[in-house]
Amino acid sequence: MRVPQTIAIDGQSAAGKSTLGALLAEALGYLYFDTGVMYRALALAALRAGIDPDDEAALSELAHQLVIDVTQPTVADGRQYTVLVNGEDVTWAIRSPEVERIVSRAARFPSVRREMVRQQQLIGQRGRVVMVGRDIGTVVMPNADLKIYLQASLAERARRRAAELRSRNIDMPLEQIAAALAERDALDAHVSQPAADAIILVNDGLTPAEEVALVLNRFVYSEQALENGH
């Protein structure tokens, strides 16, 4: 009997994946791993090397040259994890506006994604990790001990996204946010589905603390989960 050592969190856009992942990892003493940081690390390396973010061949070659690692925080400066590229701490450097501008372009190529997934899987194999991102339960960690797929109503997700934007001094009409999320949902319906054995968690009306408590009590520490070897 054991507590899940690998936890995969996927779900709809703005459903609260990162919030749940970070709080759950903190409660368990696990690594919180937002897989998007891998692509940010690659984008930073491309900027430094002068590589065009639209050049798939060059980006793929660069991705294979990089060793990207994500660990528990090594510095008490507010970070949730430490990101290393070939041994260099780039945790804050990958958050620059320059990286932000090109990361989605660098991440869209299949050959790049395959290499990033390979490196994500290496981190997942260590265990004691809560991994958050797209296709985590189906592609990156299909054998994860616990898979959670988050869903919430469009209205709830729009409200949360609006609050997040306001915290960054960005004011956007709720209707515009909802329309953008609906468009994203339509795109995701063709490319991103929950794993067959994922727990579908609808979190409308739940605070982050309530959601973490629910997951811990019902799916992590429950008698049934332990009896199943999870």
From Swiss-Prot:
Catalysed reactions, as listed in the record: CMP + ATP = CDP + ADP; dCMP + ATP = dCDP + ADP
Name of the protein in its database record: Cytidylate kinase
InterPro entries named in the record: Cytidylate_kin, Cytidylate_kinase_dom, P-loop_NTPase
Chain positions recorded as ATP binding sites: G11, Q12, S13, A14, A15, G16, K17, S18, T19
Keywords: ATP-binding, Cytoplasm, Kinase, Nucleotide-binding, Transferase
Family, per entry: Belongs to the cytidylate kinase family. Type 1 subfamily.
A Gene Ontology BP annotation from the UniProt entry: pyrimidine nucleotide metabolic process
Superkingdom of the source species: Bacteria
GO cellular component, one term: cytoplasm
Localization annotation: Cytoplasm
Record-linked Pfam families: Cytidylate_kin (PF02224)
Main location: cytoplasm
EC number: 2.7.4.25
GO molecular function: ATP binding; CMP kinase activity; dCMP kinase activity
